[in-house]
Amino acid sequence: DDNEIYVKKYSDVIEILTQNIEKITAEIITRVIEDISIKAREDFMKLPKPYRKEDVYPWRFNRAYSFNRRPIIQRDDEIIWGNRQLYHMMEYVTGLIYNGTYSTKDKKMSKLIGKISNQRGKLFNNRIVEILNDIGEFQVYPNRKKINKKSICNENGETLGDIDVLFVDVSEKRIYVAETKAFPFSRNPYEMYLEYNEMFVDKGKKKCYITKHKRRIEWVKNHLHDVCTELKLGNTDLWSVIGLFIVEEPIISNQVYNLNVEIISKAELSLERIRKVN
């Protein structure tokens, strides 16, 4: 029953599960229960290691030590839970992993999240390519590593990264250099702050997404002859190069911090909207 709250001895739960689930040990069950449990502590604001003090702040989203991620309560030798909250936890954690926002220090989990995030990014890029093709006004060239046999790199030979989507509006004589990112929606001020830093703020040698994007746009402008040669566009003097940043969800920090950077969400993508970009 989803509405029931269950209270059972820890040892009884382990015994029941080992008897009813094949190829599972008491050690594995214990590790799982410990990973999704909350225990009593002398000071509510003090969490056991390796958790951070921020993991107890109720206004923070995606806390490693929250009831959303730890729906079981341990009390002495008993555990208390509800099936509905357990199911919610599975959906919630799966969503965090898929969105690449699951906080973990486990190397294997971090590697898995990175792999899933990369795949999600590729799928999003493919979807944007489909939308641009469906508009019917563009010549679309995804995932460009080289232009006219020249690598996209700076004067020192250091790579500037691939161009996610290069597309051409022949009737308007425009070449668009598009960066695509499947960022999750920022749900609170802290996530907005992280989004702002990742998107717009350079930190030493680590450059933000906008800076990297601008460098690729500049490369295309400096190699316009190569672009026109490879894409058979004719006279370079007729063409202008436009940068475009396409995201899955609106970048709220762009408005909050009054940055006015030209960013288009997937839902906005249309011929009219694209042609408004300068």
Model-predicted regions and their roles:
Residues 1-278:
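Intrinsically disordered, low-complexity Ser/Thr/Pro/Gly-rich regulatory segments
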